[in-house]
Amino acid sequence: MDMLAMNPIKPIIFFLCLIISSLFFDGTGLARPGNGTGASQKWAVVNGFRSAHFGMTEFNVKQAIKDDFGIGKQEILRNVNTNQKTVSLGIKVEKLLPDSGTAQVFYILGYKSKRLIEIKVIWGRPVTENPDPEVIVATANQLKNHFVQKKYKKEGFIVNTQVGEGVILVFQGKDRKGRIVRLMLTNPKFEGDVKVNKNITLTLSYVEKPLDPDIFQIKEGEF
């Protein structure tokens, strides 16, 4: 199939088919994942990404980045979110998974605590100018297939669900402490000069407190 010759109004159907078609792997059917509470599965522990764990200071996160990827502090992009008043430390990493291409990793430090509260890993646009859609979808499936091997809380457990136009929640699960791992695939409609299926983005998030994020918020009664 020539992907770039596809009808531009049907790209999301193509990706849904790709994702659903890969639900069966290693002879195990995952089309009905259940509620994520299988007795034979080990509980997932969502405590960060590789050596970077929730609660770490900025100094410790930078050291974890050095240990994991050999990236020094001079190569880390530090940015302040003017809305949420959080700090992010961004890096680019090649081949987090085999043949997955370039990913951008953001380590987010809380507004009040100044400690690690979230990690985002992004593949596709805008990290890569012309991402390969098949590679992005394959990466999504590899990660999903990895995550579903563990046990999660029934509440909020989701696999392969379309949540909006061009948006698929590939996986979402909470560990026993309510910390969440979320994998989102977005494939916006044709925009401007961007070719069909070249706007695709895969975002993997690890969040410590999804219901009570450490970000700046105007308090009730202040205005």
Where are these regions (language model features)?
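Bacterial N-terminal signal peptides that target proteins for export
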Residues: 4-14
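Bacterial N-terminal signal peptides
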Residues: 13-23
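Sec/Tat signal peptide C-region and signal peptidase I cleavage site
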Residues: 25-31
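Mid-chain, structured segments of secreted extracytoplasmic proteins
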Residues: 79-126
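Non-cytosolic coordination micro-motifs
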Residues: 32-85, 118-223
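Acidic, Ala/Val/Gly-enriched low-complexity intrinsically disordered segments
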Residues: 2-5, 26
